[in-house]
Amino acid sequence: MSSVTTSGATRSTFSFARIWDQFGMLVVFAVLFIGCVIFVPNFASFVNMKGLGLAISMSGMVACGMLFCLASGDFDLSVASVIACAGVTTAVVINLSESLWLGIAAGLLLGALSGLVNGFVIARLKINALITTLATMQIVRGLAYIISDGKAVGIEDERFFTLGYANWFGLPAPIWLTVACLVVFGLLLNKTTFGRNTLAIGGNEEAARLAGVPVVRTKIIIFVLSGLVSAAAGIILASRMTSGQPMTSIGYELIVISACVLGGVSLKGGSARSPTWWPGS
């Protein structure tokens, strides 16, 4: 009889621990949010909620890409530098070409190239992600200072500012773009072969390779995606600041990684849940 009771208690404890592991951050977030609503005047006002949404929109976009890096067992320390350099590149190209779309394309291309370099060096050359992305972080940040001559680059085309200040259905555009990223990356992680391959690589890279998973290609794509969303966040930030600034977002990579980890993403890889970065933010 006692053994049955002990077994039941063990199962109950294990079940609670697993539920807490999956939803603990959501519970903490809910408690803090309710506490702020009760004790902080006007906290739940629509204006304040919009401000909070804008505050986490950039980190949210970048966290969508970082989530895949962490799920595969790696991480990307270059995201903050890509944010700054993409904003500067976009500003310079818009001013030189007088083309809004060419400037945005140049910023996104820079992010994709940065991710491609990271992915190739890490996946093909087998160099540690810490060393690789730390080097890329310094190189891309230096490139931002070179392109901008160490100064903020003002943007002359005022149409570009609508990207950061436009309101769609009553909410700022960056919030909608972040929600779109969350949905797209969530479907990519949970509903596609690419997402399953990412988790398999993070769980056991050698076993995934033996099972036929294209490890090198998958890792390269992951880092390209991380570079792209970081560049997109940098372009939106430049739009809101009305200039590209090479010194912005310093240390931002730690905020993004913390948001993912606090949201339940494992630093060891193989475990990730796409909607969980926002409580960490």
Predicted features and spans:
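Transmembrane alpha-helical segments of polytopic membrane transport and secretion proteins
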Residues: 1-24, 44
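Interfacial loop-to-helix junctions that mark the boundaries of transmembrane helices
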Residues: 14-22, 46-54, 97-102, 163-176, ...
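Single transmembrane alpha-helix segments in multi-pass membrane proteins
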Residues: 31-96, 120-127, 257, 264-274
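Alpha-helical transmembrane segments within multi-pass membrane transporters and channels
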Residues: 97-136, 180, 279-280
